[in-house]
């Protein structure tokens, strides 16, 4: 099976952190791109995930990436609706964990 690149919008929250924890152990995940507007590092935000080698990026950087296979939305419902439209137009699979859909 092909390894996939995953984006996580809202990667600094509890849901985003737990999703990162699960995906770090998944054999078919190549790269994880968690997003955050925070100035803190990933490891400082998610203390239980030290040595993960993950770094936050901003949403605009995730949107502009070329090789994203799936995006998880771990945001408020109103934000998920907005971001889902953007990623779906780029033909990227979207999984919404906000409950908006």
Show the residue positions of the predicted features.
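N-terminal Rossmann-like NAD(P) cofactor-binding subdomain of oxidoreductases
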Residues: 1-101
């Amino acid at each position: 099976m092909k390894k996939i690149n995953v984006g996580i919008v809202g990667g600094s929250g509890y849901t985003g952190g737990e999703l990162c924890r699960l995906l770090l152990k998944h054999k078919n995940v190549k790269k994880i791109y968690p997003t955050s507007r925070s100035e803190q590092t990933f490891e400082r935000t998610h203390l239980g995930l030290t040595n993960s080698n993950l770094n936050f990026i901003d949403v605009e950087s995730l949107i502009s990436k070329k090789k994203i296979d799936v995006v998880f939305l771990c945001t408020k419902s109103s934000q998920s609706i907005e971001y889902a439209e953007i990623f779906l137009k780029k033909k990227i699979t979207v999984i919404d964990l906000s409950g908006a859909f």
